[in-house]
Design a protein with these regions (language model features):
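DNA-binding patch around the recognition helix
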Residues: 2-8, 41-47, 63-110
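P-loop NTPase Walker A phosphate-binding motif
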Residues: 162-200, 205
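Conserved Walker-type P-loop NTP-binding/catalytic site
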Residues: 183-185, 190, 204-280, 330-333, ...
Length: 1007
């Protein structure tokens, strides 16, 4: 801002040339020093002005003036009607200083000082008219979209165009006008910026930036409350807004959060927030955006819920290439869910308007405008730089307040470069030689940069850098001020930005390769020191600096940290990108133990997002963990050997390759015994116990699961991340409940399942709760408790739908549909079981397929589709033979016997073994023999496994058949032997039925 302009904010007018503040038409009296404080704050609007800076600027030669700013601020607030706790104009920033926060409108005065006339002002913050000539239609369209948003119809607008076409100027002018009434209009404006080089790897970068800025502003506590209530997974990504204790709690509870949940949460926040205020959300430079941000844009755009939301995204069409934004934008635009506002060059009339505004006293605009329009094709950036160049060459000059063109427009032609690039390069060459190194180093630091970063690149004092940058800002040459940063080590540094990314790119191209490498490395090292323990927050940025600085080992290290950040946000594609880039960096390093260790860390981590994006059966998952295992054996690091083995174990276990999974589990256990860390043994016992359970080795499974549970210390392991995201305690208790039921301890099984549910609820950990609910629903299914099965399955499905857990949703669907068939519902439930099975397999899961096929077959039998049921059972046995999955084998043989009778014995009721009312024809001998063979096979398998509950159920089926054959003694002997073993669970359906049959048999024998 120049020193003699008139500035308006709200109803006030600050007349700088006449040193006067007016409220409406009335002057507002202020002491000279108080006016000077207001002037300084307005001149530095939007950035933090420290108390020390104010004292230096307003009281430069006065001792003991440290308390003077406070008095002036109090007087200003009284004069402006402002409140410290709810500021509209002047915000107190902690103990540091003040910030002027009201939107400003500048009235251009014709009498400007000569030096200010020579150089264009900061076009990022300048008044709308000079930079927005010719954009009235586009501006009006944005305002129409805002009006529709204010009435509850969400709007999404993509502002597109080539570099320099004026996207940012248009949007900034619109936002300034939209917020001109201040927040009393009920409009909140959030801004986020995508960053070149590392922005594509930072999940939700512009969204988190916008939310963080909005929630951190005074008076915006509403948003923080809504984040706590509706979007804890987002709040966990904004550590500056919460205490360390709250952050730790959030991170623990949010392990395993899914992308679907994050999208749902932000949708909930937008819905709740926009019932209170209207929200304008700007995301700039989406051509550098990440996958997750694009997913969010799609989700927000496609939602049909009312919301007072206007989302504006800017991007360069020419820079899209194969960026994923291209198909996303095409999809939304083709369905009319978003609108595009493409910017072309401005017209010759608009060029003339610009000249008349910029040079208020002149007579050349009509002659010069067509020529400038032809030269620049209406590109605003080219136009402004060309005019700057004409002023610098004094072809446009001022005398006695009048601007004149010293040559005819045609005489300028030979001096105009062929494009804006050449023109900017001419301007760069005119920069004083002593200032050029500062701009070169700044360009390596980024489009926006901290003075401290440039100081580290040049090994200079930051004060000197700030002086040089401020000199360029005053001249409005390439740079503008952006505010003040405070780094974690307490470093306070001014932040600057290039007026346009093109300037930064051209200055960066001037830097020789060797110097560029040194600059990147020094900047990375300085930021690394300053961030200390919080260095992970800028991992993606550091990865770029060290990569460009040829420090490949450190670059790979920060790619790993950036991948971990991405995984915390469930951004699996970004995590894969970081990890693959890290592995590529390591290929440039010699084969050393350190390199091997780094690759091992990356490969172990890579398996997680690969599984999430490609499924359990993906060969890429196996390759990652196999390579990790090879590397871990080279470095002989026990913990990492176990991690790699567990990764492979999960891969083969979920695929149903149980013999391989068993071997891996045994190796895990063997390795874990060599390490003092109990969590390794806990995981190894759990993995082996789970595997043995499905192999039908129930006693051994129980032993391992109990040992795993004995090692589990909730206090110690609550923050421990194991091979998956299920809490270790829940992961032990739930399968242990199954093992106990199979072994004939139904009461103990129910108790352990209840403990798993209680622990999952206590942890408030959704994935663990989904695990516990699914296992509990299946346990009720084992127990023939249809109502409880349905209730638990419906709870599972609700949680899985809300959180985005496809595995639990598929299993819940199968179990609920089975229960509904058992309770008398129709054939549509059979289709739902099939759909659940298809969804289950689509994830890449095979484990448990035999059990689900058995449930489907049983439901077919219940609905009278016996032949279909028998075909499904044949499929289940084929799967069991291939995988070794034997947990449900006895039940499959029993069901085969029941369905055989149902098919071949008229009137047979498989659920009771009784005949339908009416005549009871004798059963064919061959049918009886076939059914007996299946029942006896079921009993034999159950006895081999010591699966008393499966044995009891098979014995009930066979004894009912023998009752029909009048083999009462044999039936009684068989069933009483099995029933007599049980010591608990006598109120469960199977044991109650067995007791009823035994009483019937006894009565028959004594009759």
């Amino acid at each position: 801002m120049t020193l003699d302009q008139t500035v308006c904010f709200s109803s006030f007018r600050l007349d700088l040339p006449n040193q006067q503040l007016c409220g409406g038409a009335q002057p507002v009296p202020l002491r000279p020093k108080t006016f000077a404080v207001l002037r300084y704050l307005v001149e530095h609007a939007g950035r933090l002005v420290t108390r020390e800076e104010l004292v230096k600027a307003v009281w430069p030669d006065t001792r003991g003036a440290e308390s003077a700013p406070k008095r002036c601020i109090l007087e200003l607030r009284a004069a402006l009607g402002d409140q410290a706790d709810d500021p509209r104009f002047i915000e107190t920033v902690g103990r540091f200083g003040y910030r002027f926060i009201a939107p400003l409108t500048t009235v251009v005065d014709s009498a400007q000082v000569a030096d200010a006339q020579r150089f264009p002002q900061d076009r990022y913050n300048e008044p709308p008219l000079p930079t927005l000539a010719g954009r009235e239609a586009e501006l009006a369209q944005l305002h129409r979209c805002l009006e529709q948003a204010l009435h509850g119809t969400r709007q999404v607008v993509f502002v597109t165009g080539e570099p320099g076409i004026g996207k940012t100027s248009l949007v900034e002018t619109f936002l300034q006008q939209a917020g001109a009434g201040g927040e009393p209009r009920g409009i909140w404006i959030g801004r986020g910026q995508c960053i070149e080089h590392y922005g594509e790897g930072e999940p939700y970068l512009p969204v988190l930036e916008a939310l963080g800025r909005l929630a951190g502003r005074p008076g915006h506590e509403l948003l923080l409350d809504l984040l706590r209530r509706y979007a804890p997974s987002w709040l966990a990504q904004l550590p500056a807004l919460v205490t360390a204790g709250e952050l730790e709690t959030l991170q623990r509870r949010l392990q395993g959060v899914t992308p679907q949940r994050m999208l749902r949460e932000v949708a909930d926040v937008i819905r709740a927030l926009t019932t209170e205020v209207a929200l304008v959300l700007l995301m700039e430079d989406l051509h550098w955006s990440d996958y997750s941000t694009l997913d969010l844009v799609s989700a927000v755009t496609q939602s049909r819920e009312p919301a007072r939301l206007l989302l504006i995204g800017t991007y360069r069409i020419t820079d899209l290439g194969d960026h994923p934004l291209r198909p996303v934008a095409q999809e939304l635009l083709s369905h009319g869910q978003a609108r595009e506002l493409p910017l072309a060059g401005i017209t010759a009339t608009a060029v003339e308007q610009y000249l008349e505004t910029r040079f208020s006293k002149q007579a050349f605009s009509r002659r010069l405008a067509p020529f400038l329009h032809r030269c620049t094709e209406g590109n605003p950036l080219f136009l402004v730089n060309l005019i700057d160049d004409l002023v610098a060459q004094e072809l446009l000059s001022q005398a006695d307040g009048l601007w004149t063109l010293r040559v005819a427009p045609e005489g300028i032609a030979a001096r105009v470069p062929e494009n804006s690039r050449r023109l900017i390069e001419k301007q760069m060459a005119r920069v004083a030689p002593e200032l050029q190194p500062f701009l070169e180093a700044a360009s390596i630091a980024g489009v926006e940069f901290a003075a401290e970063s440039v100081a580290s690149a040049l090994r200079a004092h930051s004060e000197r850098i700030e002086e040089r940058c401020d000199e360029l800002v005053r001249q409005a040459r390439f740079l503008r001020r952006m505010g003040v940063d405070e780094w974690p080590d307490g470093t306070q540094t001014t932040r600057y930005g290039f007026h346009h990314a093109v300037y930064q790119q051209l200055w960066a191209e001037r830097v020789p390769s060797g110097r560029r490498q040194r600059f990147h490395r020094r900047i990375g090292e300085r930021q690394e020191r300053s961030y200390g323990r919080r260095v992970g927050e800028i991992a993606a940025e550091l990865a770029v600096h060290f990569d460009e600085g040829r420090d490949y080992a450190r670059a790979a290290q920060y790619r790993c940290r950036a991948a971990q950040n991405a995984l915390q946000r469930s951004a699996h594609r970004e995590a894969i990108d970081h990890l693959m880039k890290g592995l590529q960096l390591l290929e440039r390093l010699p084969d050393t133990p350190q390199r091997t260790q780094q690759e091992l860390t990356l490969q172990i981590l890579l398996g997680v997002p690969l599984t999430a994006t490609k499924g359990y059966a993906a060969p890429e998952v196996e390759r990652a963990y196999t390579r990790a295992l090879q590397l871990s054996e080279q470095v002989q690091e026990t913990a990492q050997i176990v991690q790699a083995l567990l990764g492979l174990w999960v891969y083969y276990f979920v695929r149903g390759e149980l013999q391989t999974a068993q071997r891996l589990g045994e190796r895990c256990l063997q390795q874990s015994r060599q390490a003092p860390a109990t969590e390794l043994a806990l995981d190894a016992h759990n993995a082996l116990g789970d595997t043995l359970l499905w192999l039908g080795e129930l006693t051994a499974a129980r032993e391992h699961l109990q040992q795993s549970l004995a090692l589990h210390d909730p206090g110690q392991h609550r923050s421990y991340v194991s091979y998956d995201v299920t809490d270790p305690g829940v992961g032990c208790l739930s399968p242990l409940a199954w093992a106990l039921w199979c072994l004939g301890y139904p009461d103990q099984a129910v108790k352990r399942s209840a403990e798993a549910l209680a622990l999952a609820h206590e942890l408030a950990h959704p994935y663990s709760l989904g695990y516990a609910l699914t296992f509990a629903a299946a346990l009720h299914c084992f127990c023939r408790q249809e109502r409880q099965t349905q209730e638990r399955a419906e709870a599972t499905m609700a949680l899985a739908s809300e959180q985005g857990f496809p595995l639990w949703l598929a299993m819940g669907t199968i179990l609920r549909s089975w229960a509904l068939v058992e309770r008398g519902q129709g054939d549509e439930r059979l289709l739902q079981i099939r759909q659940g099975l298809s969804a289950f397999q689509a994830i890449g899961a095979e484990l448990g397929r035999t059990a689900f096929l058995a449930l489907l077959a049983e439901s077919y039998g219940k609905r009278g589709q016996t032949e279909a049921g028998l075909r499904v059972l044949a499929e289940a046995l084929a799967v069991a033979d291939k995988s070794g999955e034997r947990l449900y084998e006895a039940e499959i043989h029993r069901l085969k016997g029941e369905l055989t009778l149902h098919l071949k014995a008229p009137g047979w009721r498989p659920e009771t073994g009784a005949a339908a009312p009416g005549p009871k024809p004798p059963l064919a001998k061959t049918v009886v023999q076939e059914a007996e063979r299946h029942f006896l096979k079921a009993i034999a398998v159950a006895r081999e496994q010591q699966a008393r509950s499966w044995e009891l159920r098979a014995a009930i089926s066979l004894s009912r058949l023998w009752r029909r054959q009048r083999k009462i003694a044999e039936a009684h002997a068989l069933l009483s032997a099995v029933y007599g073993w049980f010591t608990e669970g006598f109120d469960t359906p199977d044991l109650k039925e067995a007791k009823t049959l035994l009483r019937e048999f006894s009565n028959h024998r004594t009759a």
